[in-house]
């Protein structure tokens, strides 16, 4: 009787661990991670490395995109092509992502609720809401470039 109880407990524990791992690694769409039902700000910040190893921040480029506009839909479609999953940093409450030469941020506020998505070129870690998650991609450089091109087209900034 005691052996069968131990076996059942071990099987239940193993099932719980597998369910937890599946939940953590389950792919979630980046397009679904951000609320596109309201205007949002798309900001691109670029850093330039100096000879002494320090970083200089170039002037950020930012634009407010209205819901349903072609630019907002293009941003949503670009994000739909990428997935992310939770990681240990998500559970630990870590909010820091590595620094990169280019950063892209989407921010909106509706009914007092802030929505945020932050991508750093060269990293597969991103800020999603109030936590750090890991993308199912090697790094977000291509996505950052896509979103930067959308912003340049929307704001008329030549690059």
Language-model features, listed with the residues they occupy:
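Function-determining sites in protein domains
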Residues: 2-12, 16-159
